[in-house]
Every structure is written in C-alpha cells, then in structure tokens.
C-alpha cells in the first residue's frame, strides 16, 4: 500500500541495554541508551513502561488518514492501496495519570537559546486552551537536542507566550527554564517525563 508518511522518526520497540556504573561513566551510559532516538521514540518507550508498570495510561493519538484509492479483490474484502496522512488537528498525546486527564505535544529544536513558536499551529494552542477550560492538564515536552535537555512546559505559559508574541518569534530558553520543569536523566525509561509532571502537579495543588 502506498502511504505518504509525514516527516518524522519511526517508533522503536526496543531500547538499548546498558550497564550502569558510578562516576563519569554513568552519564555516558545514559547517553548511549538514547543514541539515535528521537523525542517521540523516547516518549513512546516511556509510555510503554508506564503502562506495563501500572503508573499511567498515555497513548499517542492516531494521525488522521485520507484514503485516495481502494481496491476490492473480493466481494467481502477491501484493500487500501493509496492514502496520505492529514495534518493532526490537536496534540500528539493524551491519557490519565494520578486521576488527572493530561494532554500534551512533543517538540524538538536544535536551537540553544530559544524555541521557535512556528513549531506550533494555532489549532494546537486552541486545543490546549480547551483542555485547560475543562480542568485538564496541558503541556508540551520541549527538547533542546543540542543541549540534551528536555522540559515540561505548561500550557498556561505557552498560551501566554503565544498571545504575547502573536505566534511569531521564539520563547527564550531562560523563560522555559523559569516556567518549565526539567526532565531528569534516567536509564529506564530514558525520558522519565512523569517525574517532571509530578513537580508540575505539586504547583497545581
């Protein structure tokens, strides 16, 4: 079947095994475990870990597909032979953690000093605002790939920056540090982002 896939990385189903040691080799082992993995790969592996250990139920939302051509090799069967992915209308992930509905997107940048707002679409901002209006928890996981740092950035802060900058320019790295929550380094899962969500929850209570 000919499917036109959007730019991105494939989901990995296995994670590299590491032998942890103390001292300077610890960080090297953590880095090796994430080598070649994109942000979505790390989130998907973390979600699998959370589900298997009964910590949370969080899934990646399916991307809407537009079907272009269908063949019917048999009266009782239909085969999609050509389709393409449409632009996602909301965010990447949603689920339940500690009795709360959470909804979030995942973004990466190579920039070291700021995060471009052009990486978001207005409908995503509107969606996160709607989540907040229903007492849900919304945020974005932002990864600075050049710094190997990831942050939970609250939807409230993102919406405020979007309105202030009118969806243009960038959010300063220092602003993300000030209002966000650093995801700590971890071995399994490699991106234990719920640790940062826990800190976020503490400030919400």
Curated annotation (Swiss-Prot):
Ligand binding (Mg(2+)): 90, 92, 105, 124
Lineage of origin: Bacteria, Bacillati, Bacillota, Bacilli, Lactobacillales
Keyword Membrane: no
MF terms in GO: endonuclease activity; magnesium ion binding; nucleic acid binding
Function text: Endonuclease that resolves Holliday junction intermediates in genetic recombination. Cleaves mobile four-strand junctions by introducing symmetrical nicks in paired strands. Promotes annealing of linear ssDNA with homologous dsDNA. Required for DNA repair, homologous recombination and chromosome segregation.
Site, Transition state stabilizer: residue positions: 107
Keywords annotated in UniProt: Cytoplasm, DNA damage, DNA recombination, DNA repair, Endonuclease, Hydrolase, Magnesium, Metal-binding, Nuclease
Name of a matching Pfam family: RecU
Gene Ontology CC: cytoplasm
Region (Disordered), start-end ranges: 1-22
Name of this chain's protein: Holliday junction resolvase RecU
Cofactor(s) the record lists: Mg(2+)
EC numbers for this chain: 3.1.21.10
Class in the EC hierarchy, top level: hydrolase
Recorded family membership: Belongs to the RecU family.
Gene: recU
GO-annotated biological processes: chromosome segregation; DNA recombination; DNA repair
Cofactor: record remark: Binds 1 Mg(2+) ion per subunit.
HAMAP family, alphabetized: RecU (MF_00130)
Catalytic activity: Endonucleolytic cleavage at a junction such as a reciprocal single-stranded crossover between two homologous DNA duplexes (Holliday junction)
The keyword Transmembrane is assigned to this record: no
Cell location: Cytoplasm
TM ranges: none
Tree of life domain: Bacteria
